[in-house]
Regions:
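Alpha/beta-hydrolase-fold catalytic nucleophile elbow
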Residues: 3, 33, 136
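Predominantly a Rossmann-like dinucleotide-binding segment in NAD(P)-dependent oxidoreductases
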Residues: 6-98, 152
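Short catalytic-loop micro-motif centered on adjacent basic/acidic residues
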Residues: 1-4, 119
Length: 183
């Protein structure tokens, strides 16, 4: 069982609303990245969580992409409403003797012609939980970062960027409904 918790954030719901409402126009590009640095070395002997995550007998056949890449992939499909039709991926293991991938990237083709790039890494030294997505359409773009979850940035060709904050009068009903921050 896998829970995709990032789709529950109010500003993720706001991003989805803006895309599905057509605010960005037809989606052209999706960039989603999920760098973490906690597995940058061979820490399995001293870290219980690392020990099971890098052991295919306990965690399964997928390493980094199965652990965190799936969240990035889900976030892109959720926000845009687009399904991936083709994926060209590369998995890499940088830490010597590690049995599972600890880094990966993918080029993604989505229905409707949109293209995407996904990066997931657990050897990105200095990064904690840096999930970030940028979506670009014909009329505008957006950016959301998990490390600053109450902020959504909207970008336009003809006016300044907008910073949308959780539970304000200008957010969509679905975003406001999912907010637990006092107004």
């Amino acid at each position: 069982l896998l829970t995709h918790t990032y789709t529950g954030y109010p500003m993720v719901k706001e991003a989805r609303h803006r895309v599905l409402n057509g605010d960005l126009g037809k989606i052209r590009r999706i960039y989603v990245e999920y760098p973490q640095g906690w597995l940058y070395n061979d820490c399995a002997a001293t870290n219980k969580q690392a020990a099971w995550r890098v052991d295919p007998k306990r965690s399964g056949k997928a390493g980094c992409m199965g652990d965190i890449g799936t969240h990035a992939f889900n976030l892109a499909e959720y926000i845009t409403g687009l399904k991936a039709t083709e994926i060209c991926g590369e998995l890499q293991t940088f830490v010597p003797d590690r049995l599972l991938d600890d880094d990966g990237a993918a080029l993604i083709r989505y229905e409707g012609g949109a293209r995407g790039v996904l990066m997931a890494s657990q050897i990105a030294v200095g990064c904690e939980n840096s999930l970030k997505i940028r979506v670009f359409g014909e009329k505008g773009g957006l950016e959301w970062r998990q490390e600053e979850p109450n902020t959504l940035i909207l970008r336009w060709p003809d006016r300044p960027a907008e910073i949308v904050r959780t539970n304000n009068g200008y957010v969509s009903g679905i975003s406001a409904y999912n907010s637990r921050v006092p107004a």
